[in-house]
Amino acid sequence: LMSYQLEPAQMALNKTRQRILIADTVGLGKTLEAGILMSELIARGKGKRILVVTVKSMMTQFQKEMWNRFTIPLVRLDSSRIQSVRAKLPTNYNPFFYYDKTIISVDTLKNDLDYRTHLENAWWDIIVIDEAHNVAKRGDRSSQRSKLASLLANRSDTLIMLTATPHDGKGQSVASLMNMLDPTAIADEENYTKDDIEGLLIRRFKKDIQDQVSGAFKERVITIERCAASAREEAAYDIFADMKLQMDESRTRGKGILFKTSLEKSLFSSPAACIKSIDARIRKLEKKYPDGDMPDIVTLKELKAALELITPVDFSRYAKLLKL
């Protein structure tokens, strides 16, 4: 641990209720800082019940870090697991009381109105909202995520919010998060000062703590490596360049992103990523045209066949990476 990582916990513990937005820049260890505060609260008997809400892509990483660093066991909840819990319990029993320490996706909670009543009648000692910028209020409208966060803000004494990007350039977004932490903090979301949010927010950049880390942050050195496409990659690229998709041609005036554009992105990611995109589109087309009377299916299968010929040896960027 580095000394600056203890500061959020120290700041929060100086208050009667631990409610804080940790907004350090990427790489300073916001998850670690949250874990330090959570561990101290557990040691003080104020952390028996914990709820962590994050985006789905971060659930595993957060769960592992809490266990490996702090021995805090978080049970992963999703819709199917909640339904499984509910099946074991009497009808009037709240499923959120079944486990004491859980982690759940923000979208799992926001998408099911049935959970709202259970959340309104549940209570936790600690609630953590990771990637908190996703729940900030935007303008005059409150998203489902923002409404969910506002509800959760009232279901715990301790509220820890984490984000590296606390605002979108507008003061209202930060103000909405501050008012979740303390409804009395900001009277006018368009007109407030740093003093209004003192003690609620901590934000540091690498330059702010450089003297504490003694060279821990090395300067990033970027070099450009060039690699020529293999013959099989060139063959697949040629098929793609000449490819015309009927569905795209008929939708060129639409506002959506054309499939060929998204396919191009996956193609330059990796052959496997492109094949996955092709398979998904073929499944949709075959469902819509069960007789197979759709030229796009044949065209996509031709590109897929060319991509399947690209072995790891033929995948030029991968081969180059192995040599670095």
Regions found by a protein language model. Give the residues of each.
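Walker A/P-loop nucleotide-binding motif
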Residues: 26-27
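SF2 helicase/translocase NTPase motor core
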Residues: 1-10, 17, 30-33, 39-154, ...
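Residues at the beta-strand->loop junction immediately N-terminal to the Walker
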Residues: 23, 53, 163
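Conserved Helicase C-terminal RecA-like lobe
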Residues: 38, 42, 217-228, 273-324
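Short helix-terminating capping/connector loops at secondary-structure junctions
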Residues: 21, 45-47, 253
